[in-house]
Amino acid sequence: MNRPDFEQLVADALASIPRRFRQALSNIVIVVEDEPSAELLHEMDIEPPNTLFGLYQGTPLTDRHWGYGNTLPDRILLFQGPLERDSDEDDDLVVAIGETLIHEIGHYFGMSEAQIEEIEERYWRGGGDEDEVTH
């Protein structure tokens, strides 16, 4: 898939994330890259056949102090190749992108892996409604 088409799917997936999460995002950009680098996979101790779909780079909201500011935006990296290879069709790809975005946005908010897993379970796998998920 070409990059503009993939970026449109990213926009579609982002639009499907509960509004309260989207509205709480500030000074963060979503960047699409082809693949995670071998160095990054090594640093994160990820070995084939496992791979990385996304990565949050920045300072979680819970770690910011009163003087935090004048910084470059935090970044959520999405890796197009692994996401595409893991999805059979565009609808599956939008879901995979959405799950990855939710996970990385959770890191932005300073959530633990357990908290992120609960949100993923309730929203993506369990069908909880938006108000239930975002409180």
Name each model feature, range by range.
Residues 1-95, 108-135:
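Metalloprotease/metallohydrolase-associated module, dominated by Zn2+-dependent proteases
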Residues 99-108:
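Active-site recognition of the HExxH zinc-binding catalytic motif
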